[in-house]
């Protein structure tokens, strides 16, 4: 199964031109959904206004070269390794899901449009590996890591609109693997049997994934790198996202600036500890 291109057998029923057109339509839906999401939530407007506010409060000018370095650091940290996740389990789950999705989508495009650089067997392996990684990371997240399930007592089967993205992603990968397995054992999409059923479910889940961008969390993957980069620039220029600085409460200069500190906390305030980060939120 892992060495077989599932779209080869499918081409006997659905032409390659139709499959290619379907991918183009899905790409257009993602682009259109992202733009509509951006207009509806005014996220781009927020980023520009916040950037302008940070620029007014900046204590130094960040050079173009330094910004380029910050962009590279953002890609290497927040994008490639998802370092923004404090939980190791959540981070590993996200990396499985993210790279599985990238491999699955890229291999799908190359298998359908054709590629001379890689053999069909290699791309088929990448396609199946990507779908498997998606299932590992996605189901791990859905049943064990989701904050509302893990920490807030919500049952895993209680659904809401925010779950469209992860559920359509999971069902796409799951039905793709089942369809490919049945087809590799001699099943035919046109026989109106189980192979047809799971191919149809795969098609519905895949279409839902790419056509509901405006209502799902799909678009957030495009905004997260921009937000992470903006945060690094804000720390570099001293504006600190318009948040108060990290003061030493025992410093005479700080106490002179904020006289209520010695009045209510004394001249040598105690370390208040980790606060909310004292323990992981594993109860509700």
Describe the function of each predicted region.
Residues 251-266:
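Intrinsically disordered, polar/acidic, low-complexity terminal segments
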Residues 1-252, 278, 283-284:
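Membrane-embedded alpha-helical bundles of multi-pass integral membrane proteins
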Residues 263-284:
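Membrane-proximal soluble helical/coiled-coil segments
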């Amino acid at each position: 199964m892992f060495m077989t291109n599932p779209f080869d057998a499918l081409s006997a029923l659905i032409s390659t031109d139709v499959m290619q057109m379907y991918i183009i339509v899905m790409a257009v839906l993602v682009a259109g959904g992202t733009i509509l999401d951006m207009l509806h939530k005014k996220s781009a407007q927020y980023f520009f206004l916040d950037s302008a506010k940070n620029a007014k409060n900046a204590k130094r000018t960040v050079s173009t070269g330094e910004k380029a370095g910050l962009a590279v650091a953002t890609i290497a940290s927040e994008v490639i390794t998802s370092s923004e996740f404090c939980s190791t389990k959540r981070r590993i789950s996200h990396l499985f899901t993210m790279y599985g999705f990238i491999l699955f989508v890229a291999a799908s495009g190359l298998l359908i449009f054709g590629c001379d650089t890689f053999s069909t067997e290699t791309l088929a392996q990448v396609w199946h590996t990507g779908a498997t990684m998606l299932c590992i990371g996605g189901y791990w997240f859905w049943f064990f890591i989701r904050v509302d399930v893990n920490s807030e007592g919500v049952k895993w089967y209680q659904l809401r609109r925010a779950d469209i993205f992860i559920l359509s992603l999971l069902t796409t990968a799951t039905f793709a693997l089942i369809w490919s397995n049945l087809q590799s054992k001699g099943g035919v999409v046109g026989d109106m049997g189980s192979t047809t059923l799971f191919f149809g479910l795969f098609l519905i889940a895949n279409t839902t994934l790419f056509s509901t961008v405006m209502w799902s969390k799909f678009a957030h993957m495009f905004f997260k790198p921009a937000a992470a980069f903006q945060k690094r620039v804000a720390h570099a220029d001293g504006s600190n996202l318009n948040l108060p600085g990290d003061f030493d409460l025992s410093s005479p200069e700080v106490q002179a600036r904020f006289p209520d500190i010695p009045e209510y906390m004394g001249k040598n305030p105690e370390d208040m500890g980790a606060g909310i980060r004292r323990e992981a939120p594993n109860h509700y």
